[in-house]
Design a protein with these regions (language model features):
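A short hydrophobic beta-strand segment most commonly corresponding to one strand
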Residues: 90-95, 114-116, 129-149
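Fe(II)/2-oxoglutarate
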Residues: 1-3, 116, 156-157
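Structural/interface elements that position substrates and couple domains in central-metabolism enzymes
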Residues: 66-68
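Conserved short histidine dyad/triad with adjacent acidic residue
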Residues: 70-86
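Low-complexity intrinsically disordered segments
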Residues: 144, 154-155
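Conserved metal-binding segment of the jelly-roll/cupin
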Residues: 107-128
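A short beta-strand-loop-beta hairpin characteristic of the jelly-roll/cupin
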Residues: 89, 95-111
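Non-heme Fe(II)/2-oxoglutarate
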Residues: 1-64
Length: 157
């Protein structure tokens, strides 16, 4: 029997050392993000792929194919409008500061601190009262359903 889960976002109980990640995020130079040839002022990122963490994440989530890890910075008072992530099918997002912003899909809003998201569907980030900093694992070759099923079968059953 297939596990049942929400069609857009699966909150997960998977906490890395957020204090350590937050310290690392603050040390990294932020890179500008370009979409359709235009610089975005509402999204910055910093690659972060130490081997020990890559190995741990890959084994914990059973990641296959292409994926990467990075910090994502969404500025205070900003708004990350409706979009589909470029080329990725899903992601694992951990909010590493105390941001209370929500992610919204066309049919529902979600509050989360750690979650698997379907990035192949249109979504946006709303209520950015303060800066939002994420540790994000982006997956190009695994679908949201595949990643959720692996996580549930490994950690929930």
């Amino acid at each position: 029997m297939q596990p049942k889960f929400d069609k857009n976002l699966l909150p997960i109980a998977f906490d890395l050392d957020k204090e350590y990640l937050f310290e690392q995020a603050l040390k990294r130079p932020r890179k500008k993000f370009y979409f359709e040839g235009k610089e975005r002022s509402d999204y910055y990122y910093a690659p972060y792929e130490p081997e020990f963490l890559k190995k741990y994440i890959q084994e914990a989530f059973g990641l296959k194919g292409r994926w990467n890890m990075k910090f994502v910075y969404l500025p205070a008072s900003g708004k990350l409008d409706w979009h589909i992530d470029k080329g990725t099918k899903c992601s694992i997002n951990l909010v590493i500061n105390n941001s209370r912003a929500q992610v919204e899909y066309r049919d529902r809003r979600y509050d989360y601190t750690s979650a698997i998201l379907d990035t192949s569907k249109e979504h946006r980030v709303v209520n950015l009262a303060g800066e939002r900093i994420l540790f994000k694992v982006s997956c190009w070759d695994m679908t949201y359903d595949e990643l959720c099923n692996i996580f549930i079968n490994k950690f929930v059953k």
